[in-house]
Amino acid sequence: VNMQYNQSAEGECQEENCDFTRSKSGKRIILILSALIDSRIAPLEFYALVFAMYLNIIFDRHSLEDVVGVGDVRKGKGWRNASPAKIIPFVKHLVRQMDQFPERMNTLYVLPVPSLAKGIWHFIRGFLKASVVDRVDIHWGSSSLHSSAPKTLLEFFDQSAMDDFERNRRSEFC
């Protein structure tokens, strides 16, 4: 999970201290690199709890701010790169944790999901509330190590944001 931000003491974003990436809609972005999840290091429930704790830290309790999530499922060099089927329990735990943060996730863009995973997505949808499913936007494509993010994302993010996603992903390579 990665979000770069710098706010003033009042929680306002000023031109001189805004160093976090935003979507075209102006929302802060949380980048989630699911291929880093390694159940040999910690249980999947732990990863979901850490994500919830991260949200608790970054959000002002008196704010109604919501964010855009970008779930990047591309493989990474030196990462666990678990199959989508192995991540299903993580998704279940994450949904339970996210119930503590209603309305905080505006949209979750998941990319690039291989076409073969369509069946897995339809399975996962069964565990999610309709209001959550409506906020998930899947972008299909190759998720190999050297795959580019789908160009369909340019509708929601400018090229500099897309470059930030890739730079952050590659910075985690071992």
For each predicted feature, which ranges?
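Basic, amphipathic alpha-helical/coil surface patches used to engage anionic, phosphate-bearing ligands
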Residues: 1-174
